[in-house]
Amino acid sequence: MMNFLRNRLVVLGLVLLATVLLYLLLPSMRQGSMEPSLEVQQRMGLMAATPPPPPPPSSVNITVRTGQLPGDPPLFFREALPVDSAGRQILPRLQMVLLHGQAFTSKTWEELGTLSLLASSGYQALALDLPGYGNSPDSESVKSDQSRVDLLKRFLEALGVRAPVLLSPSMSGHYALPFLQRHSAQLHGFVPIAPVGTRGITPQQYHDIQTPTLIIYGELDTNLGAQSHKNLIQLPNHTVVKLAGARHACYMDKPREFHRALLDFLSKLD
């Protein structure tokens, strides 16, 4: 009788221990079942299978300053001045002016690392907020091609920019292409990135423009990228870079390849 009671107590003890262990394990089991594994998350599109690599850090600390040019309209800009490998300010190898597309501002070039990269490579980099974008107010005074040309001229003259390389993506072609037509001799180089407005230039006008040009567009940009490429290759002094796997804003999809092509082009100009 005593042995029977002892055995029963042992069994009850084991059952109680198993119950306690199961209770303790249930929260982690429930949590694990609710959260998909990294592999499952990648299949579900909850996270990128391969995150884009960050831009390589510059070995030199670059300061990007901001300014506001008075006038109608006032123009906000960002500037990175060229420095040597020790971080000392130097005379620029070239001056570069960067415009932007409709969904972007001058801050895009700062966040992408383009301004710092140019400055650490010896170039003065100026990025402009076009009227109605970023910190530059809109204005009725820039509704014609000539008024937009005058705006760029005012910006360049006020900041002492002479013979710059002009970079123009997408929407900013409304400013850059008329300027190129009228003042191509004032540009040391031109970098169109699938700009609008390329159909408004005649074959003869293209032929007369001798400015060295780097045409950049994304492989997947079959609309404006392909259309602008077809027109821009009429420029007699051009080079083409097509960024594989990149969309309309190809510099955002492939920043390293974009920067490499840009620096290579600039190195052949100075």
Curated annotation (Swiss-Prot):
Keywords: Cytoplasm, Glycoprotein, Hydrolase, Membrane, Signal-anchor, Transmembrane, Transmembrane helix. The active site is at S170 (charge relay system), D221 (charge relay system), H248 (charge relay system). It is found in: Cytoplasm; Membrane. It is a single-pass type II membrane protein. The chain crosses the membrane at residues 9-29. Its main location: cytoplasm. GO terms for molecular function: hydrolase activity. This is Protein ABHD14A. It comes from Danio rerio (Zebrafish). The lineage of its organism: Eukaryota, Metazoa, Chordata, Craniata, Vertebrata. The gene is abhd14a.
